[in-house]
Amino acid sequence: MGFLTLFHMAFLAVSLFVSGALAAFGYTTSGNNFVIDAGSANPLIFSVSKSSCDINSIRYRGTELQYSKQGSHIGSGLGKATVSVSQINGSKSKFIKVTCVTSTLTQYMIVKEADSTIYMATYITAEPAIGELRFIARLLSDKLPYEYPYGEVSTTKGSSSTVEGSDVFVVNGQTRSKFYSSTRFIDEDSHCVYGGSDLTHVCIITPQQESSSGGPFFRDIDSNNAGESTNLYNYMNSGHVQTEDRRMGLHGPYLMTFSRSGIPKLKTVDISWFGELGVTGYVPDSQRGTVIGRATGIPSGFEGVVHWYNAAAQYWVRTAPNGDFTSPKMKPGTYTMVLYQTEFKVATSTVTVSAGKTTTASIASTFNTSHTTLFKIGEYDGQPTGFRNADKFLRMHPSDSRMSSWGPLTYTVGSSSLNDFPMAVFKSVNNPVTIKFNLGSAPSQATTLRIATTLSFAGARPQVVVNGWSAPAPAAPAKIDSRGVTRGAYRGYGEVYDVAVPAGKLISGTNTITISALSGSSGATFLSPNFIFDAVELFY
């Protein structure tokens, strides 16, 4: 072999090394894949299948992060899609746009020059056949083993047994599930998986969830180290304790960002350029409206939240300390407007939003507290706050050994602590809950026992017995066909039951009330019919 041939081979090797090491914004074709290079200082290069839209390779700073046995994709993969790629010269930046089209779904993946982020949006005209809409990044667990912000509660790698279904496991004596990674929509910032000597973070950020379902307090799976792969999700809708119909249209934009300089924050995200890219269903701020106003009647110690929704979109905002609020930019339309006392619904009205206009619409709590209270257990906040195991159930199964005893428990008014009252009553575990209280004299009039709940499973509702008198059985609540508390969920329809206690049923001295989970259904232990408490109050 001649000297010149060796020289040319060496030159070619160096050239290939340099081209791989230095970022070159753009896209190329390699076999059945489009290869997109973000041209970022920390190089991000990923490959998208021309036939399925699967992301089948993600190289960040020269390290492969994509799980090889399954791609990153919408749902469980689109199967077949028409996939195209183009470069767009925007007003301030250049972009690469990948577009994947099926008969009912269009997936967009967008890269902005010099930005190690994959911006995405999903447009649908029908719910996917699998019954949920999600993006899942399947990443290498040996490269990205850790999860943020809740850590190992959703790491199911190394499980020794299954507790429930195929999604709650035991790892080192602790119950773990992907469901325990969830965060309320209103609290979402970034959720990440991370690892490596240079501490690479891969994070999902959702600037808004206007086309998702469930409202501000809905929560769903965010991440899961499942062993072979570490999975990072953006759940846009699902059947996981879902309380409203799925919304069609554009979901997003949302983004998967790659960082070696810490955890990116939502407040730093700029998507003002998104309207330049020809994304179907995208509504720019100029075609949106705003609602301003003041929420009143929220007591001190509770958070005020205003929520707007219709069949096309949903929005929310926390109120200022004085109750003032300004909505996000909203699509035009007529909305139901709800005021929450933390998560407890206290007012409902309607408002119409017009493009390019600001609408003033204040809202006041209609929750009536003008009565004489004999006792109250908990607060009307739409959560099981303070009750036994309420501090644990979001991140572990009710059967976990770290849980306090579920009972059956007896709560004595005036001497028991709030932790002596269970957050939930299960038909086959801690039925009934007993309340004991003393009255100096018997009320001469009828009283009301109000039981505020947050979520019912398998038709459970409260059956009340007062000093041996059985109250009429309430009607079954609206069915939510999903496991709840065992998956760390507590937010349902929030049924409130007012039990009319006739005069003469309460006595001077010691009184006893029992509250049982009533249901025609059955189930074993923590999958037996159950409901979650918000507050219990006796008043006249």
Curated annotation (Swiss-Prot):
Report the SS bond pairs. C53-C100, C192-C203
Q: Which reaction does it catalyse?
A: Endotype eliminative cleavage of L-alpha-rhamnopyranosyl-(1->4)-alpha-D-galactopyranosyluronic acid bonds of rhamnogalacturonan I domains in ramified hairy regions of pectin leaving L-rhamnopyranose at the reducing end and 4-deoxy-4,5-unsaturated D-galactopyranosyluronic acid at the non-reducing end
Name the principal localization, coarsely classed.
secreted
Q: Which domain of life is it from?
A: Eukaryota
Q: Where in the cell is it found?
A: Secreted
Q: Belongs to which family?
A: Belongs to the polysaccharide lyase 4 family.
What this protein is called in its record is Putative rhamnogalacturonase
Q: Which organism is it from?
A: Neurospora crassa (strain ATCC 24698 / 74-OR23-1A / CBS 708.71 / DSM 1257 / FGSC 987)
Q: What is the lineage of its organism?
A: Eukaryota, Fungi, Dikarya, Ascomycota, Pezizomycotina
As recorded in Swiss-Prot or TrEMBL, the protein's gene is named asd-1
